């Protein structure tokens, strides 16, 4: 199983990726990471008890009002019919503005209680297994 290392100001998280269940999403995420796309980006949307969202290229500048609106310049298809499509604590899921419009933005789930409505709507493509505190 592939793993990803997500480095933040507060430490490093290790996530296992659901490459068998969501191959297109994992391939895209890994490619962006290897290409350095995510380097220096911030989690631009953090809502306690809900999610921490990152992956927007505009988030490098904390004063850029476009943070949360950017992407890689293309979109990918949702893979919400796969196994493991359950938004529980630690899950990595693709953010989007509508079905099949995601590209680079993703979020990490804080709490299952507030994310049940995301099941079947956003592709879950991994889960943090270390360092989520």
Regions found by a protein language model. Give the residues of each.
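Cyclophilin-like peptidyl-prolyl cis-trans isomerases
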Residues: 1-133
